[in-house]
């Protein structure tokens, strides 16, 4: 008789949950809210005029404990300027197969060029597609931004960019 009672007691839990509202989430159809400080995918930011904030210093790559970041810096020229200052990140790659989402790269960046977004949907069925290049990482151009390369704002110095004194490009400059 005790063995029969054990089986009935086990089914009592099952029958009790049978009439409750399910706890499952409708994830693909209805994505849930994300915490504001969630560390999702990385983003390379731009200045308000469209120039890139990355100066190609490679500090993010050195800070990464998983060795997931590859940066190749290059010099800006008078004809091709991608960022204020003398250097820019010509090649920038993040290997999301290796990234552990710790955010140490964000802390190491001196120009706040690299931040993490709330986007968490990066799954893919191809390993090669999880190595994101600069084309996927750069923030999209907003209104008032010009796609680099283009010269710095007239009369502006590197310090003006770093101190936030540069605004969007006006129509007369375009």
UniProtKB/Swiss-Prot annotation:
InterPro entries reported in the protein's UniProt record: 4Fe4S_Fe-S-bd, 4Fe4S_Fe_S_CS, NADH_quinone_OxRdtase_chainI
Subcellular location: Cell membrane
Function: NDH-1 shuttles electrons from NADH, via FMN and iron-sulfur (Fe-S) centers, to quinones in the respiratory chain. The immediate electron acceptor for the enzyme in this species is believed to be menaquinone. Couples the redox reaction to proton translocation (for every two electrons transferred, four hydrogen ions are translocated across the cytoplasmic membrane), and thus conserves the redox energy in a proton gradient.
Family, similarity comment: Belongs to the complex I 23 kDa subunit family.
Record Pfam families: Fer4_7
Protein known as: NADH-quinone oxidoreductase subunit I
Gene expressing this chain: nuoI
Catalytic reaction equation(s): a quinone + NADH + 5 H(+)(in) = a quinol + NAD(+) + 4 H(+)(out)
Organism: Mycobacterium sp. (strain JLS)
Domain 4Fe-4S ferredoxin-type residues, every copy: 44-74, 90-119
Subunit details: NDH-1 is composed of 14 different subunits. Subunits NuoA, H, J, K, L, M, N constitute the membrane sector of the complex.
Lipid bilayer topology: Peripheral membrane protein
GO cellular component: plasma membrane
UniProt cofactor note: Binds 2 [4Fe-4S] clusters per subunit.
Names of required cofactors: [4Fe-4S] cluster
Top EC category: translocase
GO molecular function: 4 iron, 4 sulfur cluster binding; iron ion binding; NADH:ubiquinone reductase (non-electrogenic) activity; quinone binding
EC number: 7.1.1.-
